[in-house]
Amino acid sequence: MLKKIGNDLSFFTGYLTFRTYDSIWRKATLPMYSKLKENLRKPTKTCLPQNDLDYRLRHTLIRQNARHYQSIKNTFINIPTFELNTFLKKEFHSNIILASPTLSFSILDYLNDGRIINSDKDIRKIVKKFRLIDSMTRLTDYNAYQLNPAIDILKILDDNTRNKLLGLFDDAIFYSLDIESFVTNFSDKKYYFQDCEAINKQFNYDVYGLYVPYDDNGKKRLQIETIILVDRRTDNTKTYVFQSNFSQWEIIRNNYINWTRTMSSVYEHQLGSNVYCQNTLYHMRKTLAKTHPITVLMKPFMEGVYFTNKVFTSFGISIADTENEVVNRYMDRVELFDLSNQTMIQALEYIHKTDGYKLLDYKKVYHENGVDDIYFEQKQLLEDLYQIVFDLVTNVFEYYYQSTDDYVKDNELRDFYLSIKNDLTFVEDLQQKDNAIKFFSNIIFLSSIRHSKNHINYAYLNSFYDYALRKTNFDLLLDKLDNGIPFDEKDCLSTVGDFYSKYSSGIYPSVPINLFGTGYKNLFADNEVQKFFTDVTNKLNQLKKNTERNNYTEFLFRLQNSNTI
């Protein structure tokens, strides 16, 4: 079964087992579909030269044998400003749905009406029609994330700051011109505050959540008590305060949890923390022999990264199509084994300019945010996983380097450190063995194990863009509230009923956000989804039991399988 799923789906579709030959997609025919499929399925040439005697020769060979892709210029006009070219090729590259079925049907209808894409004007029309986000906007509008490190997602407010934001009111919903007009005394409770900046910049909302600790059978947890939403879509700003006694609290809460989950994922990707694995591989290829123990140690995790590139190759996406898109500076879409690839150079130049490295030491993130004593399952699970990774790396180092002299005399590892330290400026002196153990443990855990588990095994395609496109936001709720019309769960989730989005809404178990996600099982009143969540939970529980295994290598290999967890 796992093999079938792996063959049927791309690396990031996870549980999205939706085959087009089982759907009405199969019945829809496009005038240009055959030509597209023919062009996109032309074979590509992949060459991975490796010469362990001279890494400079290896670099030369790689440059000479760079990947060659078939051009599809006759099908699409390459417009670097937009990602639509890439998006459409994903849509039509084979009989597998890789993007939103809802949006896919819309584009199918659009093309079936005889509208052939052959110019800049046509592409811009589709961008406008389907509200697609272009690359340049994506970079410029959201570049502000870099100014707010991911560790600031969760802030603990002092009394003075808290009093400036909002107050407690008898009414469930309160209207005001500005949230700053709310001033009150929050008693002695310790509140945890989360601000959805990702929503602010795109939709003209300010969204805030206040959490308060509670005791759960001796374990300290957090529960959300108040959600504040400032609607800035018009000149007359309105502020809505939703509290737990609000009659439709669960609906508001579930929408908010969706946003916090997707926002946290966006923060991590904007900070480039998931690119550190690629960066490490880049320098390993230049300095470490294929038989070097560190290469052997890192290989299973790097192979998972290479699988990413194989999938993108299967899309028919070439370097020429995407290397000029600025957005690729912080996306995983890098050709890792081509050292001359411009996309890789952009990634190397970008990631060390952010604070993403702080996420490598996620325990420190917890400590700095004062949530060490808060209990939630994913935190404990990932701590167990990290310890396994750390023990594995430690044992490899201790076994291979029997003495300090053995370690100091490893010229290849020294060259690796000298090569990487200018790109990853936060890297401590790897000439100290303890620093090297921690560095490789963090790279394996954050950039491979945790990133793979959080995204590959769930729903990589999910982002807050999807919630805008699917109307899974507060627009409908606010409009109905303004007009005194009751709303229900169907109103909020009517556009997330398709197979893709209901499986990808709110199932990110990443470290910064499972602090808030204890109610995800009740996100949808859908038996199929409930069963899916139950299966995931059971697998996670089984995985937690497996952390006691001693066969680390086998266990970590299993984590590389996109359908294991």
Swiss-Prot record:
Quote the InterPro entries the UniProt record gives: LipOase_C_sf
Q: Which domain of life does the protein's organism represent?
A: Viruses
This chain's protein is named Uncharacterized protein L64
